[in-house]
């Protein structure tokens, strides 16, 4: 039986001027883009080029929403019709007996810890860049926690559904603090900020029916196991702070 393979990456941040050419790799069918590729629709031509080379699975990061409402960005990408392109937003698609399950996920702020939520509201740029329902109202920590709940409840149904397919879960936000780079695990400020980037869902993911779980957002590479689930994060990063470990990583999905 052939092994399905995917080129996995996130956080290309094309809106900041990164120039990335996606190579064609023999034997690789899928390209998984785990969010923060660009801002709203600015990277549409990049997506079209990717879809000419691979079957593309794409989810939104937080940066795609900058300058727009949540609904505007979601509606745009739902409207995009490109061959070999699949946009997932609390949704899934089955290709070659693999169920790709996608969600931005967002974050639970250490289970709604008031101290973490206050810190996030002060230091996280999203709350001054992303609009909620209208252009007169920014998102808040409370509204993003509600987004997290919606995503979590969707994923709970999807990743525990024994429907016979191999499962690949793709989120933008992290779901385990194991993805936090060791250099960000000691200082108190880092420990506080980490809860703004990833939730602690180790048991939830590690005991699921997922084969591979992919995320972005952290800007440092990770590849480890949660139970029987392989976790992969392969971000590019900002132009002035590129991830030195980034490479064109190919992952076996089955």
Language-model-detected regions and their locations in the chain:
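A basic- and aromatic-enriched beta-loop-alpha substructure that forms the phosphate/nucleotide-
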Residues: 56-64, 69-132
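A structural motif corresponding to the C-terminal end of an alpha-helix
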Residues: 81-85, 154-166, 203-213
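Binuclear metal-dependent phosphoesterase catalytic core
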Residues: 2-3, 94, 181-187, 192-210, ...
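Active-site-proximal loop/helix segment associated with metal-binding centers of metalloenzymes
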Residues: 101-168, 173-192
């Amino acid at each position: 039986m052939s092994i399905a393979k995917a080129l996995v990456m996130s956080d290309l941040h094309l809106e900041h001027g990164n120039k990335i050419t996606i190579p064609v790799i023999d034997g690789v069918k899928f390209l998984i883009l785990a969010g923060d590729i660009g801002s709203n629709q600015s990277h549409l031509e990049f997506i079209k080029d990717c879809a000419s080379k691979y079957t593309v699975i794409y989810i939104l990061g937080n940066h795609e929403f900058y300058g727009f409402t949540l609904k505007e960005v979601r509606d745009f990408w739902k409207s995009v019709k490109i061959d070999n392109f699949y946009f997932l937003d609390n949704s899934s698609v089955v290709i070659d007996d693999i169920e790709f399950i996608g969600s931005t996920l967002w974050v639970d702020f250490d289970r709604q810890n008031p101290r973490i939520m206050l810190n996030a509201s002060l230091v996280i740029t999203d709350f001054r860049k992303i609009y909620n329902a209208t252009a007169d109202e920014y998102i808040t920590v409370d509204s993003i926690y509600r987004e997290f709940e919606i995503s979590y409840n969707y994923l709970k149904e999807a990743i525990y559904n024994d429907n016979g397919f191999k499962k690949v879960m793709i989120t933008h936000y992290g779901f385990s603090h194991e993805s936090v780079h060791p250099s960000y695990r000691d200082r108190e400020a880092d420990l506080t900020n980490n809860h703004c980037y990833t939730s602690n869902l180790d048991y939830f993911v590690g005991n699921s029916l997922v084969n591979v779980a992919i995320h972005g957002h952290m800007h440092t590479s990770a590849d480890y196991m949660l139970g029987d689930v392989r976790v992969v994060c392969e971000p590019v990063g900002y132009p002035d702070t590129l991830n030195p470990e980034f490479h064109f990583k190919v992952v076996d999905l089955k």
